Amino acid sequence: MAKGKRTFQPNNRRRARKHGFRIRMRTRAGRAIVAARRNKGRKSLTA
């Protein structure tokens, strides 16, 4: 049986554009995510 390809193909630009800080701050929900991570004391808030 043939297996599929690896699904994680790392790309720093795509990572930042999809999950980065500036993207998170654009929407109310994104700001809520950052706030929740701040309250929890996360060392890293976003990608």
UniProtKB/Swiss-Prot annotation:
Taxon lineage: Bacteria, Bacillati, Actinomycetota, Actinomycetes, Mycobacteriales
Gene3D superfamilies named among the record's database cross-references: 1.10.287.3980
Q: Give the originating organism.
A: Corynebacterium diphtheriae (strain ATCC 700971 / NCTC 13129 / Biotype gravis)
Q: Which GO terms describe its cellular component?
A: ribonucleoprotein complex; ribosome
**PROSITE patterns noted in UniProt:** RIBOSOMAL_L34
* GO molecular function term, any single one: structural constituent of ribosome
Cysteines joined through disulfide linkages: none
The entry assigns this protein to a family as follows: Belongs to the bacterial ribosomal protein bL34 family.
Sorted alphabetically, the keyword list is: Ribonucleoprotein, Ribosomal protein
The Gene Ontology biological process terms listed for this entry are: translation
What this protein is called in its record is: Large ribosomal subunit protein bL34
